[in-house]
Structures are given as C-alpha cells and as structure tokens.
Regions:
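Helix-loop junctions and short alpha-helical segments
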Residues: 71-72, 76-123
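Short, flexible, mixed-charge glycine/proline-rich loop motifs
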Residues: 8-17, 57-63
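Short cysteine-rich clusters marking metal-coordination/redox-active sites
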Residues: 22-25, 69-72
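A long, hydrophobic alpha-helical segment
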Residues: 120-139
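Short recognition patches in nucleic-acid-associated and regulatory proteins
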Residues: 2-7, 24-58
Length: 247
C-alpha cells in the first residue's frame, strides 16, 4: 500500500468518498453505498435559515455511514460519523459552486494509514491501530500513540527501559533509548527517522501542537522505518549480506 497523503484529507464529498484500505484484511478497499448513508440537520441549524443574514455556509449537519470491504471473503464494515457543512469548492471546468462536505470525527475500526509489516510486534501494532483511530478525532493523541509505539519498538529490540540511580529504578528517556539502539543496531538514517517520530510525539503529548501535516509525515516516515527495520526489505538485505560475506 503506497502512502497517499490525499487519501487522508480532513473532509470529502459524498461523490468522492476515499477508497480506504480495509482494516481487517488489508486487501480489499472500503466501498461506499448511498443506501448506507444518513445525514441530518439539527433544529438549531434549521432555525438559523430564517435569519436575515443566513448563508449556506451556516449549515451544520451530522452524518453517519457504513463502508464495506470489497473483498468478498472479508466483508468488514467500518462505521464513519461526523459533521457536514456547506462550503464553496472550485472546479477548473465549472468554476465555484457550493457543496456539502463531510468531516469525519470517528472511523471504527479505523483504516490503516500506513502499511504495517506482518512481522511487526503486536505491541507496536496495537499502539499504531490506536494512532489510526485517534487521527480522526484528536491529532495530538494520535501523535502521542506514534511515540508510544516507538517505545514498544525499542522494547522489541531489547533496549533498556530503566536504569538504577541512587538505589531506585528510573525510566530512561526515549531520546537515550534511541541513541542506544542506533549505537548497537541501527544506521544513522534510522536515527533521524526515530527521533523525528519522537519529536512529533512530544508535540502531541506536551503542547498538543501537532498538525495534520506533522502526523501524516510521521506516519510516512514510520512506514519506511518499519519496512527497513523489521519488514521484508530488512530480511532480504540481511540474506544478501550474509551471502556476500561467505564469498
């Protein structure tokens, strides 16, 4: 699954619902059926139509939909809900027009934003799945889960979590754990990748300043890092290296 940032815009129209990857089988895509779509305008929004200055952009609706996996043997159903508003959009051929756009606040189970290698430890996968789900409702929390998954990745590589100081066990900062991992196992490029994920996670944890772009870039970096560290690519390279060493 190639990373496509446009797939993860914060809003889309009913006529252009993204074809997300199925969170269960990872093979099918989630299909939209208009018969499984509901949109309602609350009374406060309806009443506002009577205001002398009313504008279509005042409309504030709620929506819910089911997306079904295209793989016949899977058939997973994802529930999507959120708000809808009327906004001006631009078309190169027809010019500006008003269109109702859907802004998801929840997707359950959430589609995977990146491809996660099968060999990825379950503890890392669990944190990433939470990051995927929180992406739609709380970007800061999503960024924090990315950081937590890096902690679990360091656990997988048996990098120490605690050190004894003054007779007490104290947690080792993630910065130090990454440095230790790189010194023993990694490459300089992996150092940059992992520290970038740590920094984005810190933005989410401490200041809630992580933007949608920050989080998407972090996911993109993480996909590459996981593929190199524990995915098929790392296995293939390891085999090639072993073969060449025997010459």
């Amino acid at each position: 699954m190639a990373f496509d940032r446009e797939l993860w815009d914060d809003r889309f129209s009913v006529s252009a619902v993204p074809a997300f990857t199925c969170p269960r089988c990872s093979k099918g895509t989630l299909q939209f059926d208009k018969k499984q779509f509901w949109k309602v305008e609350p009374k406060f929004s309806v009443d506002a139509h009577g205001h002398e200055d009313w504008d279509p952009e005042w409309v504030d609706e709620r929506f819910a939909m089911f997306l079904k996996c295209s793989a016949e043997k899977c058939g997973e159903i994802v529930v999507v809900s959120g708000s809808a508003s009327v906004e001006q959009v631009y078309d190169e051929e027809y010019g500006p027009s008003m269109e109702s756009l859907l802004v998801p606040a929840m997707m359950v189970p959430a589609p995977p934003i990146i491809r996660v290698p099968e060999r990825t430890p379950q503890e890392v996968q669990a944190e990433l799945q939470l990051a995927f789900q929180l992406f739609w409702s709380d970007l800061g929390a999503s960024a924090t889960k990315i950081r937590t998954s890096v902690e679990r990745l360091m656990d997988h590589f048996k990098v120490a979590k605690f050190k004894r100081t003054g007779g007490k066990l104290k947690p080792i900062p993630l910065f130090t754990r990454i440095e230790t991992f790189i010194a023993k196992n990694g490459k300089v490029v992996h150092k940059d990748h992992l520290h970038a994920l740590r920094v984005v996670g810190n933005l989410g944890t401490h200041s809630n300043a992580a933007t949608r772009s920050d989080v998407l870039e972090a996911f993109q970096i993480y996909e590459h890092a996981l593929d190199e560290l524990i995915g098929k690519k790392s296995t293939v390279i390891a085999k090639l290296a072993k073969k060449l060493k025997q010459k």
